[in-house]
Amino acid sequence: RRQRQMCIRDRFGTGPSYGMSSQEVMGWMEYGGGRKLYDETLAKVGFDYIGFFHMPMPAQPFGWFKKNVTKVSDVKGMKYRTVGLATNVLTAMGMVVRQLPGGEIQPAMKTGLIEAAEFNNPTSDSQFGMQDVSKHYHLGSFHQSQEMFEIPVNKKTYNSLSPAHQAILKNAAYAANSDNYFKALVRYSADLAKLMNEHKVNVYQTSDEILAQQLKGWDKVIGDFNKKDPFFKKVVDSQKSYAKRVMKYLLMNQPNYKLAYENEFGPIGKVKI
């Protein structure tokens, strides 16, 4: 039961996407019913704090491999490191998942304990030295496509504050959200360029075949949890209801920004940065 409760908590910031990025999930949190459900979740798990979500992350890369992988058959049976609900999703895809802390990933790749791994982004991945054990980096994945950080505030302390001071905390979290997201894009892109230019890392976009299979994995995992836990299903249904309306508008209204990028710079996979 405790494990299911923690999985419910994970459900707020990992996946499946339903077309949403982490930015839209934060919109659901604040204006789509997510906040009330999250407070219920914290009470169920036994955490006595108020959580402010901030810094929505770009989708996490699929990660580091010994070669370019393009087909589901390329990764089936592969020993791979990830954590959270993504372990269930990628296991459903046929991968052999190992949950390892960040500091153990690079040594595990070096010794062969795992054959592939993800951690978070080009900056943290390079700090762990992943470029020293792999030269094949796959960007874009649905395994953890909408994560964010959280600022926890003791509930008793928060409730003792005046409404004005509570509002200051909330809006400070919003400010940190935007500022850190802007900084992350600058930092991640600069470190990706360093990986490509100084360490000769090959960078790929994860294939649609693999992405589609990840979504099928999510369907299975979410379906299994929905059957076991009505509250988990309640959270999922709320997200789906929000995504169906909001993303209908957003995805139909957004032009193809990749088309505009390639109009200026050429095929994205061949652009040198």
Regions found by a protein language model. Give the residues of each.
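N-terminal secretory/targeting leader peptides
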Residues: R1-Q5, R9-E24, E40-I273
